[in-house]
Amino acid sequence: MKVPSWKTITGLAAAAILALAIGTAPSQAATPVQSTKVSAGLSASDLSKLPLTDRHLTERERANLAVVLQAYHDGEGDSLDPQGFMDLFAADGVLNGIGGVEGQTSLRGTQLSGLIVFLSQFLPDIHRELKQITVSGDVVSIELSIQGTFLGPFQTPAGVIRPTGAKIDFPTADFWYLRNGKIEKFDCHIAFATLFGQLGILPDYASAVAASAPGGN
């Protein structure tokens, strides 16, 4: 089966970024559920189950962590809640998607749910495995893997990449900045190159070499 070339990745990233920038209204998302907010008072038992670098958190840090954990819950395939996700942000909150060809795409307002909706469209069973969590005041830093099964179409300007049923697992680093119990900024660093490789988009080294040669286009 012929797979898209590495040059196509630019188009794919553009499609992804376009999908994120436009976003999808909560009413259009796949089977959204009513938001069920977690308690701000995470217990010692709750904390013991998490991969925390330091379990001695202040009350404010526990509350901030609870907000972030709720955001992940709202982005899971079996509990997708775009509106609930947006409600966790401050009025001027921003989500920065980082790692694509464009470098950074910023989402605000009704666009904030664009990232979780975009990912759930081709990974309907999406799950985030949290590997390491560091809480420092109003900043929550998390190393994680985004996992799922390629069961939905992946839209690109060149056409649709049809689902293959492949298992997807790519690394991500998330940095959450909170203010007064709301998310002020969410920087999401996604390893798009790893994701594209698992979707079957292979590098086209020959074209890159040709383009770099004298007189190349």
Task: Place the predicted regions along the sequence by residue.
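Residue-level detector of short, conserved catalytic/binding motifs and their immediate flanks
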Residues: A71, V140, D174
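Thiol-/selenol-based redox modules, centered on thioredoxin-like
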Residues: G200-V209
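A solvent-exposed, acidic/Ser-Thr-rich amphipathic alpha-helical stretch
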Residues: R62, A66, P82-L144, T149-L151
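Bacterial N-terminal signal peptides that target proteins for export
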Residues: K2-A13
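Short beta-strand edge/turn micro-motifs at domain boundaries
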Residues: K167-G200
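C-terminal segment of classical bacterial N-terminal signal peptides
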Residues: L18-S27
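Short, low-complexity N-terminal intrinsically disordered segments enriched in polar/charged residues
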Residues: A29-D87, A91, A211-N217
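Short, surface-exposed loop/helix-turn segments at secondary-structure junctions
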Residues: G152-T164
